[in-house]
Amino acid sequence: MATFTDAEIDELFETSGTVIDNIITAQGKPAETVGRSAIPQGKTKVLSAAWEKHGSIQPPASQDNPDRQDRSDKQPSTPEQTTPHDSPPATSADQPPTQATDEAVDTQLRTGASNSLLLMLDKLSNKSSNAKKGPWSSPQEGNHQRPTQQQGSQPSRGNSQERPQNQVKAAPGNQGTDVNTAYHGQWEESQLSAGATPHGLRSKQSQNNTPVSADHFHPPVDFVQAMMSIMEGISQRVSKVAYQVDLVFKQTSSIPMMGSEIQQLKTFVAVMEANLGMMKILDPGCANISSLSDLRAVARSHPVLVSGPGDPSPYVIQGGEMALNKLSQPVPHPSELIKPATACGPDIGVERDTVRALIMSRPMHPSSSAKLLSKLDAAGSIEEIRKIKRLALNG
């Protein structure tokens, strides 16, 4: 079973809260994607290259027809003619190449693409064609155009070798000369005009941004449901762990009480052992019994009573008399009933036997019990025997 610390549990709760907030505040997925990318696998590089090529195509105004280039190469060089301010650039003649180019690009993009992607690209191409027509047909384009006489003061702009992309066609009124002139009014219009300009002319001096490949685009957020299920599983596991920890705490809370109860039991057992030892000492008939097995053996032996008068001949003395003791038992010799008069005092033999039984019944080390027994045998007075008895009770 995995264990979690308090810090890990707090981190899990914070992470789950952050994920839930992101899920609540996240934007809805498009209806056409349904959690998956509309671009098939393996087509990203081809589509990105085609789109970059489509974006890099120059407007038709900056390109010359091949037949005109051939004719201009064959014709002798003529001086440049000025363009009038009110002459609009050619627009209608330039639309067919643009449409053909868009159709070619769309044909390339349709390879391996889905219907939703093709529809999106068609809309973008329509918007780009409308944006091309807007700036050329605007009524204010005369304000942005400049006559070609000012090109003499700006030779750097007129250099067609450094900027071949800035070349534009001449006005329709002067098409008879078939001369290509560098027209800078169109470049400034592409910079100053407002609105959508998807096909602005390139300039090496203005390219400050680095192109980024479309291969590393972020996938759609289709793993939210998986994250939610993972977080739910983690929360369930954390709750189970917390419940098990509570059970462990409840079970371990009784350990100190159990220790105190065990100590009390030890004390009770010691008191009972001392009481049993004293009971053995006070029992004069069982002074030599120090174990339960010996006590049971003594209990098994019981006296046997023989009924009838019996044979009194062994107890009959001369003259047909019989000597009886205090318990009315026959005594074979009457001299046993006569005892010498002695001073009254404690019997040292009985006291020694009692202390010996006490030492043997006590749970002591064998060396300690042997030492006390040797002292008991060497004792010659009641006081010494009582001292040995105290040592046996205390040890």
UniProtKB/Swiss-Prot annotation:
Location within or outside the cell: Host cytoplasm
Domain of life the protein comes from: Viruses
Record's function text: Essential cofactor of the RNA polymerase L that plays a central role in the transcription and replication by forming the polymerase complex with RNA polymerase L and recruiting L to the genomic N-RNA template for RNA synthesis. Also plays a central role in the encapsidation of nascent RNA chains by forming the encapsidation complex with the nucleocapsid protein N (N-P complex). Acts as a chaperone for newly synthesized free N protein, so-called N0, allowing encapsidation of nascent RNA chains during replication.
Main location per the UniProt record: host cell
Region span, Disordered: 46-105, 127-181, 193-217
GO CC annotations on file: host cell cytoplasm
Family stated for the protein in its record: Belongs to the rubulavirus/avulavirus P protein family.
Lineage, broadest ranks: Viruses, Riboviria, Orthornavirae, Negarnaviricota, Haploviricotina
Assembly: Homotetramer. Interacts (via multimerization domain) with polymerase L; this interaction forms the polymerase L-P complex. Interacts (via N-terminus) with N0 (via Ncore); this interaction allows P to chaperon N0 to avoid N polymerization before encapsidation. Interacts (via C-terminus) with N-RNA template; this interaction positions the polymerase on the template for both transcription and replication.
Gene: P
Domain comment (free text): The N-terminus consists of a long intrinsically disordered tail. The central part contains the coiled-coil multimerization domain (PMD). Forms a four-stranded coiled coil structure. The C-terminus constitutes the alpha-helical domain that binds to the nucleocapsid (N-RNA complex).
Name this polypeptide is given: Phosphoprotein
Keywords: Host cytoplasm, Phosphoprotein, Viral RNA replication
Biased composition (Basic and acidic residues): 65-74
Region spans: Multimerization: 222-285
Biased amino acid composition, Polar residues: 75-101, 127-180, 203-212
